[in-house]
Amino acid sequence: MDRQDVISQLALRERINFEVKKAENSIPKSVWETYSAFANTIGGYILLGIAEKKEEEGDSPYLITGVNDPTKLKKEHFDSLNSDKVSTNILTDDDVEVIEYEEKLLVSIHVPQANYRQRPVYIKGNLNKGTYKRNHEGDYHCTEEEVKAMIRDSNDAGNDGVLIEHYDMEDIDMLTLRAFRNRFRSTNPEHLFNDYDDKEFLRNLGGYTKDRATGREGLTLAGLLMFGKGLAIRERFDNIRLDYLDQTNLQPGERWSDRLTYDGSWENNLYNFFTRVLARLVQDIRRPFVLKGYEREDDTPIHKAIREALTNLVIHADYMMTGVLRVEKHDDRFFFSNPGTLKLPIAEIYKGGNSKARNPHIQSMLRMLGYGDNIGSGFPTIVDACKKENWQKPLLCESNELHTVELTISMKSVIAEECIQHLRKILGEQVVRQLDSEEIFILSVAWMDGSVTNSVIQTLLDKNALQVGKLLYSL
């Protein structure tokens, strides 16, 4: 962080990834709450040496007080990080800098997002009362459920291999399992699993297990959710709903043109939901005539992208939380939402090369049918497909307040000519000429979507919070 970064950050005021503290002579206790909150959310910057003014004290909300001995503060900070004050130290020397600003010395602390194995990051040795998260510009205690979710996610083995006691083969919908096995046999005709009976087949897929310590056996979370009877699933997972809405070609007064949710006419397990929704999503996507050898190639990049998005929805959802797996089809976009938060940082997901499914057994089941992968190339597949169509970059967002992950695949052009015309109309030709391509892009997104945020622009332009802060400040 440099002087210009300080100017742009202060202009945008405190928010989800930026906090100021007075700290003239020592580290304030509240720094550790913010440290925990940033680490458990998306990371951020803490600036020491700046106090918040009362509203009546002038236009600027900040008073630059400076720190008297930055070297002492840095040592105090790292001594505390390496003590029992915090559960883990995720900072390096490069994360703490001294900055000169308005003839005062400030200390900048960059707190990165902790990786999923390190979370929850908590303070004072108190897991339940010392774990914080960041919402808007404040630090808040995590609820017991939020702490439990972070602990679950820290397990590399995932969540879906656990034995669900008192649920067995009687709770499997055999029509669903037969449909899966038929597709499996078609995709893998020589596979050894084809000769197994249903229980052994499920056991090898991770859908059935035995606790060797107790001798108890039964369905796993993956087995019940993927192939279970609807009633059995609703009895055990009444916290989860499945919902698909087609909102294309709506007439006045219509809320949807097609909907798939539980209505008693189908067994509402994940495999049935996945196959029914996928068919509806791609049914009217054009398939250009392309030959691969002597056969027609019907699998377009957009078909692959939609499959990947739906696969991600199912394998990354947190089925222990209360929420909805929601899929929406609109005239100009596809929308996917699932309960839970992201295990990996958003920037890392866009880059690809790393895959950490919350439900690896469900992921394996779908992959054996040709859906998705486990090498981290899935999301770049979605990005590349949109780029080939000249669509906007797909927007992946998470809400730590609502505990949801949302993906929007927009069919709008990157920057439509009507956006440029609108900007010329409201800003004037002269102003638009002075804007660079990134500034025009930000204003275009704001016009199309109604507003923009730092985190959204980070994703769309592949920039960090400080870089986007400078752009927003310039506008």
Predicted regions and their residues:
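Conserved N-terminal catalytic/coupling substructures associated with nucleotide/phosphate chemistry
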Residues: 1-302, 311-423, 430, 444-447, ...
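Conserved polar catalytic motif of the HATPase_c/GHKL fold
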Residues: 307-308
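Short helix-coil-helix linker/hinge
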Residues: 432-440
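Alpha-helical DNA-recognition elements
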Residues: 474-475
